[in-house]
Amino acid sequence: MALLREYKEIAYQWGIWKTEESPEELLALLPDPERYEQQLTLFSSPHRKLEWLSVRVLLYQLLGEEKTIEYAPSGKPHLADSSYFISISHTRGYVAVILSPVSEVGIDIEQYGQRVHKVAHKYMRPDELISEYQGEDTW
């Protein structure tokens, strides 16, 4: 399994998954794989299938139960049973999910690189900026 980080509090919880599995391996991590197989046929891109499945596996890992993710016309995700607010992000083989039972949440994950470095000052306080790149994975 590729759960890289997980953090839980009363007000929210989040996790980061590094996708290293095949679609078949990801399906095997879910309690009811058949539930997802038909939806997978809607994706033509193998990469997109992996992202989509990784989000569902991460959500299951965080909550310990399956939840259905639906999307508003704007593309914003929400859980069908409204038990949690949810935000989803993905970048180059990683997915992140944050959940809160009490308030709207947001998460964004980006692979560190020149593109992020050039715009980080627009979205982050000085104390949040990474002052020095320290390896492949910087948290």
Task: Locate the predicted segments by residue.
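Core catalytic alpha/beta fold that binds nucleotide/phospho-ligands
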Residues: 1-139
